[in-house]
């Protein structure tokens, strides 16, 4: 996301579900000119080419997320992120004001960093070399979540699945 002190504007979003499904999209509506130096250096170069089908309007991203999250399904939606307050705002703004957010979408994102501290700050895997790509970060957060909640590192299970490329903030 772009954060210039006045706006939080979604650039891309990556989501990984516990069942292994993935969602990834890049907004066609953010203004790269408003990105600060850090985002220009660490985020924008990792985006797919603009001709990619992964570039979508905010409406298309919103609708894709509603389907991916199964907001009409029986399971409640639970969101987790590492220091995810601004990420949550960028997500919610896809629906406009908070009052327009579907009731199935949580009004908060659970905090992986706090879970890590509550578990005694256990050793975590290093950040991937290509971090700051929304999908790479989401995969890494899922890896950390599973490691903290089960004690198992899923990295060896992901190798085969990840070699096939990206599928889905």
Walk through the language-model features, giving the residues of each.
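Short, flexible loop segments at boundaries between secondary-structure elements
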Residues: 103-124
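Substrate-binding/catalytic groove segments of enzymes
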Residues: 98-102, 122, 152
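Conserved non-catalytic scaffold segment of RNase H-like nuclease domains
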Residues: 1-82, 128
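Short, contiguous clusters of charged residues that form electrostatic/catalytic patches at enzyme active sites
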Residues: 59-63, 67, 110-113, 140-143
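Short beta->alpha linker loops
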Residues: 60, 83-86, 107-110, 133-136
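Acidic, Mg2+-coordinating catalytic module of metal-dependent nucleases/exonucleases
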Residues: 79-84, 123-169
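Metal-dependent nucleotidyl/phosphoryl-transfer cores and adjacent nucleic-acid-binding surfaces
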Residues: 1-4, 9-10, 16, 86, ...
């Amino acid at each position: 996301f772009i954060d210039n002190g006045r706006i939080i504007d979604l650039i891309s979003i990556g989501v990984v579900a516990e069942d292994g499904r993935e969602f990834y999209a890049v907004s066609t509506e953010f203004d790269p000119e408003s990105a600060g130096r850090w985002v220009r250096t660490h985020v924008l170069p990792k985006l797919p080419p603009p001709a990619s089908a992964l570039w979508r309007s905010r409406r298309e991203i919103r609708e894709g997320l509603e389907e991916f999250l199964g907001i009409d399904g029986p399971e409640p939606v639970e969101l987790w992120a590492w220091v995810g307050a601004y990420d949550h705002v960028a997500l919610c703004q896809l629906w406009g004001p908070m009052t327009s957010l579907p009731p199935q979408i949580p009004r908060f994102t659970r905090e992986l960093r706090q879970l890590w501290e509550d578990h005694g700050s256990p050793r975590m895997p290093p950040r991937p070399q290509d971090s700051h790509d929304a999908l790479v970060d989401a995969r890494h957060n899922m890896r950390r979540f599973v490691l903290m909640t089960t004690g198992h590192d899923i990295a060896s299970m992901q190798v085969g699945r990840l070699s096939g490329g990206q599928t889905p903030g």
